[in-house]
């Protein structure tokens, strides 16, 4: 994939490729330090140990270069379990309460929290949201930068870049919706193709 595009920004833009070559890669552990990182991970593990959910699966904390992805049910849940947790989360606000507890515990530590998808949320250093890539793109002086995302409301992991004045934000619901919106915007003569 990275060879097909001029730029690829992974993990909130903290891993950057240009013309298929790795340009920059940030590491959350280098930025936060091991002590804060372990305090954060330990707090999350303790919090999740006390959660009573209909189901729990594996991979509750996924360590990535630019963030931690926290999933109370576990990332290895089945698609059906994902939907079940999402419905429960809408009613009981499990992730919202978890994030509120983290915000209290780690106030002033330079951390941000954002909802990601149906079963998880992301934890990353302030300034490491999806706008991170825009500074690189500013240097290229593009006329327009379009962003497509599904978590575009406040608290969602797409909100900041969706709302940034340097982008034209598009809220989408699925990969198919994204393809359709791209056709409408960039290839209007093909907008009605399947």
Predicted regions and their residues:
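Active-site phosphate-binding/coordination module
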Residues: 1-59
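A short acidic, often aromatic-flanked loop/helix-cap motif at beta-alpha or helix-coil junctions
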Residues: 14-18, 119-122, 176-180
